[in-house]
Amino acid sequence: MSLQGQIALVTGASRGIGRGIATELGKQGVIVVGTATTQKGADAISEYMNASDIKGCGLALNVLDATQIEQTLSVIKSKYGEVSILINNAGITRDNLLVRMSEEEWDDVLATNLKSVFRLSRAVLRPMMKARQGRIINISSVIGSTGNPGQANYAASKAGLIGFSKSLAREIGSRNITVNCIAPGFIETDMTEAMSAEQREKLLRDVPLQRLGQVSDIAAAVVFLAGVSAAYITGATLHVNGGLHME
């Protein structure tokens, strides 16, 4: 599937990994629609796309709202056409030890990180099946494979994405639609930039490559899985973590 002229929907695209993915896809000639939870965030997406000469726009979307999802896809269809690449990147954390974790903290994370992926994927499937091509790429996490104290909800949601992707890949492979996961490790972000040297050293102790990942590392993996070179890859999880977790 050539990337030129394809239409991508990238959730959680106002900053960080989502912004990097949207930008890199745009550089490859993809029409990109990035979403944010607020109009301010959506406007910021449109601004950086315009500044980088990327065709597309930002839209406000609450990924928990099924009606908004349908409305957003309708807007995209009227402006650009049907979505052919879906990047499920939006996610949240609500960290707490399980003994103290509230039902709300559990439900919020599972709804945003997993149920929204079910809804968005289901919503784009019929047009992809009709076109007999498509890419669905779900952004999981190394935590989904390793677990982490205080993140049982987050780990469950990210592990769930891996099982979801494998199952969906088996369902729709005959329609030439691939479904894959990318599982980032520790990525350089505003939060990691604020770490002390001691905290950073501790973080990198178990990373063989001895550095944090860059947003560009994740974006490059997305471009690969979205493109023609990955046409025979489906149901896979690509771990981009500097060797922190190996399979």
Q: Residue spans of the language-model regions?
A:
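Active-site helix of classical SDR
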Residues: 121, 157, 165
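Alpha-helical segment proximal to the catalytic Tyr-Lys
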Residues: 126, 170-174, 231
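Residue(s) in the substrate-gating loop at a strand-loop-helix junction
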Residues: 141
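Conserved glycine-rich Rossmann-like NAD(P)H-binding loop of the short-chain dehydrogenase/reductase
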Residues: 28-44
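Short, small/polar-rich loop/turn modules that mediate ligand/substrate recognition or access, typified
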Residues: 173, 178, 233-235, 241
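Conserved glycine-rich cofactor-binding loop
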Residues: 7, 14-16
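Substrate-binding pocket helix/loop in short-chain dehydrogenase/reductase
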Residues: 97-98, 102-110, 192, 203
